Structure formats: structure tokens, C-alpha cells
Regions:
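Short catalytic/ligand-binding loop motif for oxyanion handling, primarily in non-cytosolic enzymes
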Residues: 91, 177-181, 274, 291-292
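C-terminal non-catalytic accessory extensions
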Residues: 275-301
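A short helix-loop-beta-strand connector motif used in the catalytic cores of GNAT acetyltransferases and
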Residues: 73-82, 260-264, 273-278
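Short amphipathic alpha-helix that is part of the acyltransferase structural core
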Residues: 26-80, 84-96
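Conserved N-terminal entry element of GNAT/NAT acetyltransferase domains
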Residues: 2-41
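Acyl-donor binding region in acyl/amide transferases
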Residues: 55, 65-68, 100-262
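Aromatic sugar-binding interfaces of carbohydrate-active proteins
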Residues: 247-254, 263-281
Length: 301
């Protein structure tokens, strides 16, 4: 059982603005927001504010650390794509990313956040070195329903455009513990069934186990269905539970062609330190990126 304390007070606005001004401007949106790449720095006001807003946002969906800020040891060597509203002087959202090759050289596997939740086989290092880990994405509640998440993806696209050797995106994608158990079971079973990892490159340290009733019902449901038809069946099951597929699950899977092996879920586990959410470890092969997605986010010319 995890209790939650008070969330930290906001950082001084001008200190946050000045810290972000030292970052790399990746782009600007038509409605006046800036997309900034922030490097880690000790006691950075912008990073402290990101940690505060992460905790605030994740608690709204039944996740979070229970601490004053959601900051951990990985924030000290990861970078952050930040969406900044220069009119409201407000951090709108952020995405944490880590270039796995340099992190492995400096810290080994222990330097990757994913490794704290999943144990990688030695063979996984080959793809990890060509990858960027994504995670801890959020948009503050006041901007839900806006284009803010898409703006953050434009920032990821700008980041990848400057680093064309990047082959993979990977990282944990969460399902809230507030979601009904049956809904989580259906979601996990669908993604395991249609986007499996035949190489078994990672295993959850705290595996997620599907209940036997849904295990058999889901297996029967997908029989004879391709991924698209299976998705329609999944949506029907979730609708009965008043649940929708989480946005990031839809977004990652939709980046690539559905049956080309471009997206794999390596395993699913439970994170007791983050509200007992369920994490699916995803790997996206950018070599299978849909042309429309490449044109939208990377090849802007």
C-alpha cells in the first residue's frame, strides 16, 4: 500500500524560463509554444518543475511515486524534450529520453531506466546501442485535449532528424492501476498476441499475470483475426468496461505497419514504486516507420 504526500510548491517562473532558455530550441508551434531539448544539470529549476508536474499529472490517472516530485537517479543523465507555453509561462508537458549507446558506455545496463523494471538478455545490447529510450511522458491536465502530445512528438522527430543513425525507440508504456483488472488483462493479451518478441530479449522483474478466464477468452477471440480485426474486437471488450485504449499504446503501434514486425512488446510487468501500474516494454523499429509518419515528424522538407 502506497501513501501519497503533498506535492512540492511550483518553482519560480523566471528561474524555470531562464533554465529552459539555455536549452536547444527544437521548434516552435503555430500557437506560440516552444519545443526545447533540456540537458540535465544539478538542481535545475526547470527539471525540478518537470518532476513536480509529472507527479501532479500521474496522480490524476492513478499513478505517481507518492513523493513531492517524480524525479529519480536517471533524470541526472537523461535529456528532456519540453513543451513550453511562452505566453502562460507554463511547462505544458515533457518527454524523457536517453541515448542508450552513450549511457551503456558510461553506466552499463544499470544506467537505463528500463533495466530497473526488465532484465535484458545479453543479445539485447545490440539493439539497445542503436536506440533511444523514451518514457515519463506527460501533458499537464490543463492542456489535455489539445495538440500538446503531438507537439512533443514533433520534438522527438526533430531530435531523430539530427541523429539519423538511431534505429530503435524503446521504453516502458504504462497502464494505470486504476484501470479495471479485466481491461488490463485484455490490453496485455492483445499486445502480447499480435506484437510478440520471438527473441525473448527482456523479462519483467515483476511479471504481470493475466487471469485464467480472460487468458482463455482472449485467445479464443483473436483466433482467425489479423491485428486490425483483433483491434476492433479489443475495443468492443473495453467498451463494455468503459475503457479506451491508452493514447500512447495507440500512438506507438500506429507508427509502423501493423504486420511487419516493426513494433514488439518485449514483456509486461508491474511497477510497485509507481502506483502498481503495469508497464509494457515496447520496441519500435524506425526502419518500418510508415511513410506518412516519417513525413509528419522527421522528413519535414
Amino acid at each position: 500500500f502506497q501513501t501519497s504526500g503533498a506535492i512540492a510548491h511550483p518553482e519560480p517562473v523566471q528561474a524555470v524560463r531562464m533554465a529552459l532558455a539555455r536549452g536547444e530550441l527544437l521548434g516552435a508551434t503555430s500557437d506560440g509554444k516552444q519545443i526545447i531539448l533540456l540537458d540535465p544539470a544539478p538542481e535545475c529549476p526547470a527539471l525540478r518543475e518537470i518532476g513536480r508536474l509529472r507527479e501532479l499529472t500521474f496522480r490524476r490517472v492513478g499513478e505517481g511515486t507518492g513523493g513531492r516530485r517524480d524525479l529519480d537517479r536517471f533524470d541526472g543523465h537523461y535529456r528532456h524534450i519540453v513543451l513550453w507555453d511562452s505566453e502562460a509561462l507554463q511547462v505544458v508537458g515533457a518527454y524523457r529520453l536517453g541515448e542508450a549507446g552513450p549511457i551503456l558506455d558510461r553506466f552499463g545496463l544499470a544506467g537505463l531506466y528500463s533495466h530497473s523494471l526488465f532484465e535484458f538478455r545479453p543479445e539485447a545490447v545490440e539493439f539497445l546501442r542503436d536506440g533511444v529510450e523514451l518514457g515519463r511522458s506527460f501533458v499537464v491536465p490543463a492542456y489535455w485535449g489539445s495538440r500538446s502530445l503531438d507537439y512533443l512528438w514533433q520534438g522527438i522527430g526533430a531530435y531523430l532528424r539530427a541523429r539519423p543513425a538511431t534505429r530503435y525507440l524503446f521504453g516502458p508504456v504504462s497502464l494505470s492501476a486504476d484501470m479495471p483488472t479485466a481491461a488490463r488483462d485484455w490490453l496485455v493479451h492483445y499486445h502480447r498476441h499480435y506484437y510478440p518478441d520471438p527473441d525473448r530479449l527482456a523479462r519483467a522483474r515483476n511479471p504481470y499475470r493475466i487471469g485464467p478466464d480472460i487468458e482463455s477468452a482472449a485467445a479464443a477471440t483473436w483466433q482467425g483475426l489479423d491485428a486490425r480485426a483483433g483491434l476492433a474486437a479489443l475495443k468492443q471488450q473495453l467498451a463494455r468496461l468503459n475503457v479506451a485504449i491508452p493514447v500512447l499504446y495507440r500512438q506507438y503501434v500506429d507508427l509502423v505497419e501493423p504486420e511487419d514486425g516493426g513494433v514488439r512488446f518485449l514483456d509486461f510487468g508491474v511497477d510497485p514504486s509507481f502506483g502498481n501500474c503495469v508497464d509494457g516494454l515496447i520496441r519500435v523499429d524506425l526502419g518500418w516507420l510508415k511513410p506518412a509518419k516519417r513525413a509528419r515528424y522527421i522528413d519535414l522538407d
